[in-house]
């Protein structure tokens, strides 16, 4: 059970950092699809 909690926290932190970078400078690959 503890492993699940630690994994969830790790994924959550990585997700937040990923989102921060995403919004700071949007990737051009996705910009192509999302025009």
From Swiss-Prot:
Keywords: Chloroplast, Membrane, Photosynthesis, Photosystem II, Plastid, Thylakoid, Transmembrane, Transmembrane helix. It comes from the Eukaryota. Pfam families: PsbT. GO terms for biological process: photosynthesis. InterPro entries: PSII_PsbT, PSII_PsbT_sf. It is a single-pass membrane protein. Disulfide bonds: none annotated. PSII is composed of 1 copy each of membrane proteins PsbA, PsbB, PsbC, PsbD, PsbE, PsbF, PsbH, PsbI, PsbJ, PsbK, PsbL, PsbM, PsbT, PsbY, PsbZ, Psb30/Ycf12, at least 3 peripheral proteins of the oxygen-evolving complex and a large number of cofactors. It forms dimeric complexes. Found at the monomer-monomer interface of the photosystem II (PS II) dimer, plays a role in assembly and dimerization of PSII. PSII is a light-driven water plastoquinone oxidoreductase, using light energy to abstract electrons from H(2)O, generating a proton gradient subsequently used for ATP formation. Belongs to the PsbT family. HAMAP family: PSII_PsbT. This is Photosystem II reaction center protein T. The lineage of its organism: Eukaryota, Viridiplantae, Streptophyta, Charophyceae, Charales.
């Amino acid at each position: 059970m503890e492993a699940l909690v630690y994994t969830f926290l790790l994924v959550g932190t990585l997700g937040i950092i990923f989102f921060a970078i995403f919004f700071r400078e949007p990737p051009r690959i996705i910009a192509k699809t999302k025009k």
